[in-house]
Amino acid sequence: MKTKSWRKQAPRTNPERRISYMKCGRKCFLQPGTLAFPICPKKSCKISCQGLRAAYARARQTKRPKVARLALIKACHAKCTWTRRRGYCERIH
């Protein structure tokens, strides 16, 4: 999966993630308690399809099926193109 451009946008360090959490709230993380799996860019509170794709890939790599499923559900609601091409949304609903 291509997520290179997300690498530049993602809040990577813990202080960046805390600022993003205080500014945007729980919606920008798939695991807000630990500030894991950010899905919004640093300077925006809008959910990014690239962030959802990166979170989905990382959750699959680390064997976290609940997080991967949550990323897919949010991506389907956001109408991300990568979910429609592979037919993920039909399998979820």
Write out the residue ranges for each language-model feature.
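Extended terminal accessory/targeting regions
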Residues: 1-93
